[in-house]
């Protein structure tokens, strides 16, 4: 459709008005809606964002350390801390400037304080406590996984309770979200998280040397290469087939993959650190096994929820989030399970699945609305590197020992 020039000009002026109006003190929206600044530094992203109460993002800024950590072969906490220290002030300043919001207009500051890398959490928390004291603003400490779980509600109305699968570089958990700060933990990883496994497999395969993968995270590199791979050329056993609970384990799979890589290196007569000819097939088989493992544990969690009336009978929902949730193949695997069990599957877009300041600000909005966990600026808060989410129900899930009817995991590439 073509637009008349005059109509286009009017639209342009309206859009200009909308963007200048955002966040300005005299603007109805900013004046009537409470504003929250969110700050994230739990791992390797320095993020900040200002949101209004409706979930409108007024301004955001994100500094990713990904490329630095790719070069050093993983996150070195002291390096992460230094990069947060160098960037936090600028990132927060940018988010405020882009929103056209002055600190005096904020209703609260929300910051990730758990779980995460101690050195990284410390930078965000110290900055935030100084900031709230300086501007005399309430402080809302945020649980990073609670924020991942609630992000979807910023984008569309999703009523509690819903089931959530959170998969990232640091976490793997299944929980029922019953309220903003009310979770039932059904499953968690017993060793490492799927993103960590994919990052380590990518490193072992030296994918950083692959022309298409030099700036991609391990998970992204595996997803890209798997598209041209034949997953049937390597057969890895899906973990925990004989354990009838909803917990996860990925270390054994990583071991299987490493052994396969070593065998291939010997066959091809090449040294570790050289790209194998079969990287696409190994990527495809690894991704498939991760996807199948996540799908099976989630299937059992859905059956447990159904047996115990933990989800509503009308539009029961599974929310998939966290960095690994941006993987399209994994999304398809989960959609096979939700289709078979009558749930709707919701995944935030990739940019909201990985760590960012927006999700923290949104969690602040949710808590502000309900008046939960809002502290005066003077209260001293400590960060917690380890912090479980919700009430631990993993023993009850295990005791239920639910057997799965087999669902064919024919996942299209
Ligand atoms: O949520 P996130 O940004 O940070 C943590 O809290 O860990 O997740 C980062 C993780 C990394 O391990 C990365 O390899 C993985 O998410 N990841 C992916 C994809 N994109 C990022 N894993 C699989 N497929 C992807 N497309
Ligand atoms: Zn995360």
How should each PLM-predicted stretch be described?
Residues 314-334:
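Glycine-rich phosphate-binding loops at beta-strand->alpha-helix junctions
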Residues 33-107, 111-115, 144, 148:
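N-terminal beta-alpha supersecondary unit
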Residues 29-34, 42, 49, 59-60, ...:
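A short helix-loop
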Residues 114-120, 126-128, 133-157, 176-177:
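Active-site neighborhood for divalent-cation/phosphate handling
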Residues 27-34, 141-163, 363:
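Conserved phosphate-binding catalytic cores of ATP/NTP-utilizing and phosphoryl-transfer enzymes
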Residues 141-142, 317-318, 335-360, 377:
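Conserved phosphate-binding/catalytic loops in two-lobed NTP-binding clefts
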Residues 1-33:
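N-terminal mitochondrial targeting presequence
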Residues 242, 247, 251, 260, ...:
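Adenine-nucleotide phosphate-binding core of ATP-dependent small-molecule kinases
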